[in-house]
From Swiss-Prot:
<protein>
    <recommendedName>
        <fullName>Glutarate 2-hydroxylase</fullName>
        <ecNumber>1.14.11.64</ecNumber>
    </recommendedName>
</protein>
<dbReference type="GO" id="GO:0050498">
    <property type="term" value="F:oxidoreductase activity, acting on paired donors, with incorporation or reduction of molecular oxygen, with 2-oxoglutarate as one donor, and the other dehydrogenated"/>
</dbReference>
<dbReference type="InterPro" id="IPR042098">
    <property type="entry name" value="TauD-like_sf"/>
</dbReference>
<dbReference type="GO" id="GO:0008198">
    <property type="term" value="F:ferrous iron binding"/>
</dbReference>
<keyword id="KW-0408">Iron</keyword>
<comment type="similarity">
    <text>Belongs to the glutarate hydroxylase family.</text>
</comment>
<comment type="function">
    <text>Acts as an alpha-ketoglutarate-dependent dioxygenase catalyzing hydroxylation of glutarate (GA) to L-2-hydroxyglutarate (L2HG). Functions in a L-lysine degradation pathway that proceeds via cadaverine, glutarate and L-2-hydroxyglutarate.</text>
</comment>
<keyword id="KW-0560">Oxidoreductase</keyword>
<feature type="binding site">
    <location>
        <position position="292"/>
    </location>
    <ligand>
        <name>Fe cation</name>
    </ligand>
</feature>
<comment type="subunit">
    <text>Homotetramer.</text>
</comment>
<dbReference type="GO" id="GO:0019477">
    <property type="term" value="P:L-lysine catabolic process"/>
</dbReference>
<keyword id="KW-0479">Metal-binding</keyword>
<dbReference type="InterPro" id="IPR015038">
    <property type="entry name" value="GlaH"/>
</dbReference>
<dbReference type="GO" id="GO:0106343">
    <property type="term" value="F:glutarate dioxygenase activity"/>
</dbReference>
<dbReference type="Pfam" id="PF08943">
    <property type="entry name" value="CsiD"/>
</dbReference>
<comment type="pathway">
    <text>Amino-acid degradation.</text>
</comment>
<feature type="binding site">
    <location>
        <position position="162"/>
    </location>
    <ligand>
        <name>Fe cation</name>
    </ligand>
</feature>
């Protein structure tokens, strides 16, 4: 099942009291909610998962769901339904999550455990070919010689969807800040499709549904090209996207010009959010109607940022939802 899903309109009011965490609208947009685990929840979670090092989560995939259940139980089983309803709700679909007391690179393993628990309450994180694990950790430094914009600090990483060059469904993306030193700038950039003023123009274009070729550079460790259109629809006919400017390969002049105009229209949108993500926090978004990117950094010889990502598919009890296949 995937994100092309209609959910019954019974989302929990963000003003409701929850057990083990708080939930409020973010300062940037009511579409983006901030979820904070209390100090007690954080400490009890870390105590109960201490017996499993990160390597155990890597080797035994069922443990990723076990730590998710532990976290949900600590939240009186209110967390899992809240996560699903928020991420599947077209009006929201995004969370900024943190746990009180997890805010230092020395706690990197604890960060991976927490993010893994949250992700596996909504689905399962896909194999990441770049890292060879279900998650990837990577570092941005002042000088970069890589073959994509992922680690390049002094330019904007344009807005995009993840999973465009793989065959696996990528319903959600999780991006966590593990470390940051000598950093200015570099906020996360987000754009909800319904806030993009040029959506209707490009969605109705004849090329919007034409399958196009997506090919990744060598660092991604993916050798097979995939073909799919830039736009699709959910069960209610609303637009969703699978797009990244770096990896789409236009076959002719017509496609190249249209993709260039599409990129310009996205990057100049007035609906873009700039979201600071402190160390220990992570963004969790619906990948099919949110685009994400990163603003540029101010140069510094000792600039360093370490990130962790997970991306995967939604999985839940089907009798509560109608799923577009």
């Amino acid at each position: 099942m995937n994100a092309l899903t209609a959910v019954q309109n019974n989302a929990v009011d963000s003003g409701q009291d929850y057990s083990g965490f708080t939930l409020i609208p973010s300062a940037q947009s009511p579409r983006l909610l901030e979820l904070t685990f209390t100090e007690q929840t954080t400490n009890r979670f870390l105590e109960q998962v201490a017996e499993w090092p990160v390597q155990a989560l890597e080797y035994k995939s069922f443990l990723r769901f076990r730590v998710g259940k532990i976290l949900d139980d600590l939240c009186a089983n209110q967390l899992q339904p809240l996560l699903l309803k928020t991420l599947l709700n077209r009006a929201e679909g995004a969370l900024l999550i943190n746990a009180v007391g997890i805010d230092d690179v020395a706690q990197a393993d604890e960060m991976v455990k927490l993010a893994t628990a949250v992700a596996h309450l909504i689905g399962r994180s896909n194999f990441d070919a770049m890292s060879g694990q279900y998650y990837a950790r990577f570092v941005v430094k002042n000088v970069d010689n890589s073959d994509s914009y992922l680690r390049q600090p002094h330019r904007v990483m344009e807005l995009h969807n993840d999973g465009t060059y793989v065959e696996e469904i990528t319903d959600y993306v999780l991006m966590m800040k593990i470390d940051e030193q000598n950093m200015q700038g570099g906020n996360s950039l987000l754009l909800h499709l319904d806030d993009w003023e040029h959506l209707d123009h490009f969605f109705r274009h004849p090329l919007a549904r034409r399958p196009m070729r997506f090919a990744a550079p060598p660092s991604k460790n993916v050798s097979k090209d995939v073909f799919h259109p830039v736009f699709d629809v959910d069960q209610q006919g609303r637009p969703v996207m699978r797009y990244i400017d770096q990896f789409v390969q236009p076959k002719d002049f017509e496609e190249g010009v249209w993709l260039s105009e599409l990129s310009d229209a996205i990057e100049t949108s007035k609906g873009i959010l700039s979201v600071p993500v402190p160390v220990g926090k992570f963004l969790l978004i619906n990948n099919l109607f949110w685009l994400h990117g990163r603003d540029r950094f101010t140069p510094h010889p000792d600039l360093r940022r370490e990130l962790m990502r997970q991306r995967g598919y939604f999985a839940y009890a089907t009798h509560h939802y109608q799923t577009h296949q």
